[in-house]
């Protein structure tokens, strides 16, 4: 209701109706569609060459973590059921607040395991707010061994200078850790958002195609980040096609 009323500026009565409507009437409920695409591709390539990660953002009261939702809600349970159907691995997306208070990472992991009764298969930060080496150290000490945050919002590409995962180096000891950083190659908002690259569809397709081919040429890991809302044609005209 609050998302439809405050974010989408729908009239209160329409927002109330949407909050009680079936999932298929929700423009943002794109999970069955894109998870089916992902599973078809993974089955074609083989499990050793493709993985589906479904990240669940942990709630906080920080303004940039809105909307504040309940991870125990029936809606989230339905999303998880779709993820399980298509064999998606469940990851933890830390709140934006955790990007500024690293001690929250462990707290949010404990909450994740309590609610979903499983260990998260990976970590990423909301809005890519893994800002300091201490954030990565806290992730490591909280039990994470795979981090998918490494990237920047403004430009797509090889932000570590490589398309392959690398181990995090503890800057205090100058030693390798077992925390693997999976560099982000392509992100939906980076391509289209006016604050970033602001590309049109044809330009975005050309950039994405070049990055995919370059990653393949060097036997890299193509790490993609797409948001469920932008995969709705009602929310964005071409991200569903590009994905």
Describe these PLM feature segments.
Residues 54-58, 92-96, 124-127, 148-150, ...:
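A cross-domain feature marking catalytic cores of carbohydrate-active enzymes
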Residues 35-51, 69-90, 109-116, 141, ...:
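Acidic (Asp/Glu)-rich catalytic clusters
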Residues 1-9, 80, 102, 109, ...:
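Residues lining hydrophobic/aromatic ligand-binding pockets adjacent to catalytic sites
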Residues 1-77:
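Active-site beta->alpha N-cap acidic-glycine motif
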Residues 16-24, 57-65, 88-96, 193-197, ...:
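Glycine- and acidic
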